Amino acid sequence: MLSEQTRTIVKSTAPVLAEHGTTITTVFYKNMFEAHPELLNIFNHANQAQGRQQAALANTVYAAAVHIDNLEAILPAVVQIANKHVSLGVKAEHYPIVGEYLLKAIKEVLGDAATDEILTAWEEAYGVIAGAFIDLEEDMYKKVENQKDGWSFFKDFKVVNKVKESDAITSFHLKPADGSNVPVYQPGQYISIRLDIPGEKYLSNRQYSLSQASRPDEFRISVKREADNDPNGVASIYLHDHVNVGDLVEISAPAGVFVLDAKNETPVAFISGGVGITPMMSMFETVATLTPKRPTTFLHAARNESLHAFDKDIQKHAATMENVSYHTVYSDQPNGFITREMLEQYVDISGEAYVCGPVPFMEAVIQHLRAMGMEDSQIHFEFFGPAAAIKQD
């Protein structure tokens, strides 16, 4: 329990963190990785290079300062981050390292303004927050390891099939190398894949959505090939060009909070852009299998037909459903965007909406859904990468 004095001091630093947060977290990561380069085997280097991880951490630290009196308010974000940590293999022993370099970064950036009183308050606050993460993640590790066919950290999987889904997306079907089955996962969850890429100094970790409904014998991930000059492209290009049937890759157990309530039978809309279609595939197939009478809408936006993955699969599942509407738009054609008018025509605002795609796409769709009268509790969305904030207007 934090003292009133500590909470007051931490809250008073919120405006400073809003102004200097990203600078602090940039210094933090730079100094921590210089002292502990082994941690680069865990973190996504591309997110570091693009500044996304720094911004995400700054947002989290700021939110903790604002809500220090009621940390329950940031519990959804904590659970989301903890899922990512468990997927990546973050351990309790890493938290003191993070705390040390975060405090040093605050002092380095703020200088004399970071008084001993402020640093002591933040040290206490970090201890409480880190303890909450450690306890939650320890419990999550136990659950994933103790579930049927579960494991913790990473396990070898064999590529048993490789399928081109579009000009940009390729699916990899993965089975445990030891011949065991895979655990049941929730539609919408992801796995982490850890790659030792020739020429790269550190391991590369990436999260990919499971793109088919849960089945006992295999996982399927569907990977978009990023541009050659994109920092995110290192892993995807390696997978597309060098990982083939028979090869082994390291996989973590399914994780994530962007999941479908498979028992709910209220109207549901899946709205995706580009590779954001991948988690929707496991959700849509699950609805088709378990609740085929559920009123369902699937809206997808792609650049063109050659980049549109899973069209035949969606039509196959839709044919087994009683109340389904499936529509696609291509941005290289006239009227090729998901507009408010389209959403008003096809989305039942009394139900649930699941949104995934590029950030500008999600911002536009979510703003339209809110304007149509949907509550935030009805709208679910997933970022591919560190969580950011959806703009309100």
Spans of model-derived segments:
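Generic structural "secondary-structure junction" signal
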Residues: 19, 41-45, 83, 90-92, ...
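Glycine-rich His-Gly loop
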Residues: 37, 195, 273
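Short alpha-helical basic/polar micro-motif
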Residues: 30, 100, 186, 278-281
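FNR/FR-type flavoprotein reductase catalytic core
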Residues: 120, 234-393
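Glycine-rich, flexible loop/turn motifs
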Residues: 13, 35-39, 84-86, 181, ...
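Globin-like tetrapyrrole-binding proteins
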Residues: 1-154
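Ferredoxin-reductase
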Residues: 147-248, 302-304, 331-333
